[in-house]
């Protein structure tokens, strides 16, 4: 009986993880891809204009912590006093933001 419950719990947790990944992909497509690119490369017109980093690059990924990424998504980013990324803290939940950071980490090659 315990084994059946364990297997069922594992299936539920695994399917939840798939849903989170799909949700993060959708959130990325709707809110981030226009600047950061569908694939996280930053190779878009706006990304080039803003000098967006390529999230495939392991060095780029190593340059910021998950907490820093979460803060940037929540609060936005300013460069020399000019907003270069709008804040999403009023639009996305903490869970959405954490899922986005995990999705960003998945771009690393």
Regions found by a protein language model. Give the residues of each.
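Acidic/histidine-rich alpha-helical segments that form the ligand environment
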Residues: 69
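Axial heme c-ligation environment in periplasmic c-type cytochrome domains
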Residues: 45-58, 72-107
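The canonical Cys-X-X-Cys-His
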Residues: 30-38, 100
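Short sequence/structural segments immediately N-terminal
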Residues: 23-30, 80, 107-109
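Electrostatic cytochrome c docking/interface patches
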Residues: 13-29, 43, 58, 63
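Detector for the c-type heme attachment site
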Residues: 35-44, 106
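Post-cleavage N-terminal segment of exported redox proteins
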Residues: 1-22, 103-109
